Amino acid sequence: MMEYPNQSGFRQRKLLPQVRMRGSAMEPSDPTQLFDDTSSGVNKHEPGRVGKSPDVFSGQNLLSDPMSNLAMAYGSSLASHGKEMMDKNLDRFIPISKLKYYFAVDTVYVGKKLGLLVFPYMHDNWEVNYQQDTPVAPRFDINAPDLYIPVMGFITYVLVAGLALGTQNRFSPEILGIQASSALVWLIIEVLAVLLSLYLVTVNTDLTTIDLVAFSGYKYVGMIVGVVAGLLFGRTGYYLALLWFCASIFVFTIRTLRLKILSEAAAEGRLVRGTKNQLRMYLTMAIAAAQPVFMYWLTFHLVR
């Protein structure tokens, strides 16, 4: 506050504006202050102490609590144990690791395998290659069974069947579902019948159920070609294509399975003689002869 004389000789006082620096605390008596100034980061009630959020202390206390650490360790152990049990039980019913082997294919393998299914007459070596008592992946051996071609063949067969039914104005989702279900049921019946026959004949073979599914699914290639030929060239084209692929799948199955079913006699260097070995030979021929029957049964009604 300053005093200066005026013309009348009296002194007048001039009030200077009160300036508050930014960041300084305001007096409690300031009527214009609505909230406490916390921008300085200093606690009013505890001068000189840096203020921290209570959440930080609660998080640190939680991490340093022995009971919390014990609960976290127990939860992690329980989760890992549950995952291990789930993988073990899942692998018991669905052998995921084995299925990966049957889908280890590439474009070169698929092309060669399809060519072998179309024309198997000039192929000489039908033995599956092994590496340390384990069969090599299908992409390295054309004789190894795979599931890629059978699975894609089944899906393509259902689509081609829907196309054939559509050209005849007989298509409906229900009929297509029945077509796919019947093909799947016949495949399951075929595999179960072969397994039962192998058990009754007491064949000592390394054939697995997945191998039988693969060999039974190769016939879908000929079925697809037969139906497409029927759509393009009529029933004559259908019968010609089906006849060719029936003969091809018969030769392919005979030459593939005889090394599996008759492997015991072949390993001992014995000829296929005796009642037991003759039963195995007849079983091999029966499995091969069943392929053309299923091919005709599942396709003849699709071509008119």
UniProtKB/Swiss-Prot annotation:
TM ranges: 147-167, 183-203, 213-233, 237-257, 283-303
Membrane topology, Cytoplasmic segments: 1-146, 204-212, 258-282
Principal cellular location given in the protein's record: endoplasmic reticulum
Membrane-protein topology: Multi-pass membrane protein
Region of interest (Disordered), residue spans: 21-54
GO biological process: one example: sperm flagellum assembly
InterPro entries named among the record's database cross-references: Yif1_fam
Cell compartment(s), UniProt: Endoplasmic reticulum membrane; Golgi apparatus membrane; Endoplasmic reticulum-Golgi intermediate compartment membrane
Record's keyword terms, sorted: Endoplasmic reticulum, Golgi apparatus, Membrane, Protein transport, Transmembrane, Transmembrane helix, Transport
Pfam families: YIF1 (PF03878)
Polar residues biased stretches: 30-42
Keyword Transport: yes
GO cellular component, one term: endoplasmic reticulum-Golgi intermediate compartment membrane
Extracellular side: 168-182, 234-236, 304
Record carries keyword Transmembrane helix: yes
Sequence similarity: Belongs to the YIF1 family.
Function: Functions in endoplasmic reticulum to Golgi vesicle-mediated transport and regulates the proper organization of the endoplasmic reticulum and the Golgi. Plays a key role in targeting to neuronal dendrites receptors such as HTR1A. Plays also a role in primary cilium and sperm flagellum assembly probably through protein transport to these compartments.
Protein name in UniProt: Protein YIF1B
The species this protein was found in: Danio rerio
Gene designation per UniProt: yif1b
